[in-house]
Amino acid sequence: MEEFQGHIELDRSWQDNFFYPLIFQEYIYAFAYDHGLNKSILLENAGDKKYSLLIVKRLITRMYQQNHLILSANDSNQNEFFGHKHKKNLYSQMISEGFAVIVEIPFSLLLISSLEGKEIVKSPNLRSIHSIFPFFEDKFLHLNYVLDILIPYPAHLEILVQTLRYWVKDASSLHLLRFFLYEYRNWNSLSIPKESIYIFSKRNQRLFLFLYNFHVCEYESIFVFLRNQSSHLRSTSFGALLERIHFYGKLEYLVNVFTKDFGVILWLFKEPFPHYVRYQGKSILASKGTSLLMHKWKYYLIHFWQCHFSVWSQPRRIYINRLSNHSLDFMGFFSSVRLNSSVVRSQMLENSFLIDNTIMKFDTIIPIIPLIGSLAKAKFCNVLGHPISKSVWTDLSDSDIIDRFGRICKNLSHYYSGSSRKKSLYRIKYILRLSCARTLARKHKSTVRAFLKRLGSEFLEEFFTEEEKVLSLILPRDSFTSRELYRGRFWYFDIICIHNLANDE
């Protein structure tokens, strides 16, 4: 037990730092808008893990001299056309952005210290959304059931403050956090909406993204097991959650989880190979076990959230599905495990017989109906999928119109490049190409056929990805190798987040 308790002990060196005085430094807001800053330079030296307020003040002062996003007193007359309400919202938003940066500082240093202590190399591939799907392909073929979980959110804003209170001992900063939460009451935007793309409100996005990830990782860390066959609630490896939007871990052994704060022993169910994956507000827990075991996991999670985090989760927010019978709606794909049968004729001497081979295959299918609905909402087509002109773009230049359509088409091609069936993707690309042609024809008061005849093949090349352009130069389009490459699945490890299609302008 002492060994477990040693793992749970926190590094108190940074908890005594007070962040509240930085709120009154106007330079901190230049820091808030400089997202490219490498926070590792906040360490005083290479061998010291302590965070320095002096270094932070020097950095934000230097950035302020090159940043013009800060409103000064001289700008008050220029901003009089803003109403009082708009000014209040603008200033409060800037303060919340600065507060988010200040709170992120110690957790960023904790992440760096954790990675260095474990000698873990930070790989950009781990941050990619697509890195989850190769994990599915490798593991799900051997699993039976999956829990489809909508992560609950606190019913009261004070729960967020209490969660952060364990780590931040600055009472003034916590009071300021309460002010932001009760001022805007944006926590409802963290619930699971109908459109999976939207989870956080655009206002105060950085602050609420941090609070949401921090709150989730508090109870999510119980699923993270150390390699030395022990586990504790506040694992040192939880810091990876602060950097990535998604997280997956593997449970390997049944252990006693000692929780210093709760003062109780939590027992996990004996299960050798469950796998956990989360992206934004949705998570899945896949297992090789039986249906009874998955029902135990379901009610364990419900009672765990209610008893220890005061979070109400209804049973209907957790679905138990058998992988061989149901598709998993996750991250814009319908994923399933299906049986792929093939018959082989074998000849042995004078006897011939047929061998029926059954192979498990992981399928990722594009949800064509919801995607056409998104295109219809963005005015690229009607609800039936027939392309229409984008009238609001007719005032733009021809090159801008083609560039916008081409960028959306390329983004969709990259994201859905891992689909098992490319027919739906080709239909989406056809809708965008014809919508672009109709928009240009409407602008020039011409017909689509005449406009396409004038532009020729150069118009279609704008919608090709870089990979498709290279393949068209190397291989003939009708060759067998080319067709196999076009039908193949590709996962791009440079995709970090999903952008809203309608606002990708």
Curated annotation (Swiss-Prot):
Keywords noted in UniProt: Chloroplast, mRNA processing, Plastid, RNA-binding, tRNA processing
Q: Cite the InterPro entries for this sequence.
A: Domain_X, Maturase_MatK, Maturase_MatK_N
Instruction: Give me the Gene Ontology terms describing cellular component.
Output: chloroplast
Subcellular location(s) per record:
Plastid, Chloroplast
Return one Gene Ontology term, BP aspect. tRNA processing
Coiled-coil ranges per the record?
Answer: none
Q: Which residues form the signal peptide?
A: none
One GO MF annotation is: RNA binding
TM region positions: none
One family from Pfam that matches here is Intron_maturas2
The family line of this record is: Belongs to the intron maturase 2 family. MatK subfamily.
User: What is the role of this chain?
Assistant: Usually encoded in the trnK tRNA gene intron. Probably assists in splicing its own and other chloroplast group II introns.
Name-wise, this protein is Maturase K
Say which species the protein is native to: Phaulothamnus spinescens (Snake-eyes)
Taxonomic lineage of the native organism: Eukaryota, Viridiplantae, Streptophyta, Embryophyta, Tracheophyta
